Amino acid sequence: MIIPVRCFTCGKIVGNKWEAYLGLLQAEYTEGDALDALGLKRYCCRRMLLAHVDLIEKLLNYAPLEK
């Protein structure tokens, strides 16, 4: 859905790193190297970006029925 603002475990802010992470992946970085470049060293914070599934664009296609 929407990238969480903070890490669920330690509380570090990770929401502002999503766009930069995608940019690094487009620049042919591996996932691990991209996370290292963003300064995410803890595995709890790394999993927040690695496990995120970006579904918001697909969900916007389904508008609720108007009455």
Curated annotation (Swiss-Prot):
Location in the cell: Nucleus; Nucleus, Nucleolus
Highest rank taxon of the organism: Eukaryota
Major subcellular site: nucleus
Gene3D superfamilies xref list: Homeodomain-like
Keyword Electron transport among record annotations: no
Gene Ontology BP term (one): regulation of transcription by RNA polymerase I
InterPro entries per the UniProt record, alphabetical: RNA_pol_su_RPB10, RNA_pol_suN_Zn-BS, RPABC5/Rpb10
PROSITE patterns from the UniProt entry: RNA_POL_N_8KD
Disulfide bonds, paired cysteine numbers: none
Keywords noted in UniProt: DNA-directed RNA polymerase, Metal-binding, Nucleus, Transcription, Zinc
Positions bound to Zn(2+): 7, 10, 44-45
GO terms under cellular component: cytosol; nucleoplasm; nucleus; RNA polymerase I complex; RNA polymerase II, core complex; RNA polymerase III complex
GO molecular function: DNA binding; DNA-directed RNA polymerase activity; zinc ion binding
Key word Lyase present: no
Subunit-structure text: Component of the RNA polymerase I (Pol I), RNA polymerase II (Pol II) and RNA polymerase III (Pol III) complexes consisting of at least 13, 12 and 17 subunits, respectively. Pol I complex consists of a ten-subunit catalytic core composed of POLR1A/RPA1, POLR1B/RPA2, POLR1C/RPAC1, POLR1D/RPAC2, POLR1H/RPA12, POLR2E/RPABC1, POLR2F/RPABC2, POLR2H/RPABC3, POLR2K/RPABC4 and POLR2L/RPABC5; a mobile stalk subunit POLR1F/RPA43 protruding from the core and additional subunits homologous to general transcription factors POLR1E/RPA49 and POLR1G/RPA34.
PANTHER family: DNA-DIRECTED RNA POLYMERASES I, II, AND III SUBUNIT RPABC5, DNA-DIRECTED RNA POLYMERASES I, II, AND III SUBUNIT RPABC5 FAMILY MEMBER
HAMAP family on file: RNApol_arch_Rpo10
Similarity annotation: Belongs to the archaeal Rpo10/eukaryotic RPB10 RNA polymerase subunit family.
The protein's role, per its UniProt record: DNA-dependent RNA polymerase catalyzes the transcription of DNA into RNA using the four ribonucleoside triphosphates as substrates. Common component of RNA polymerases I, II and III which synthesize ribosomal RNA precursors, mRNA precursors and many functional non-coding RNAs, and a small RNAs, such as 5S rRNA and tRNAs, respectively.
This protein's name: DNA-directed RNA polymerases I, II, and III subunit RPABC5
Record lineage: Eukaryota, Metazoa, Chordata, Craniata, Vertebrata
Gene: POLR2L
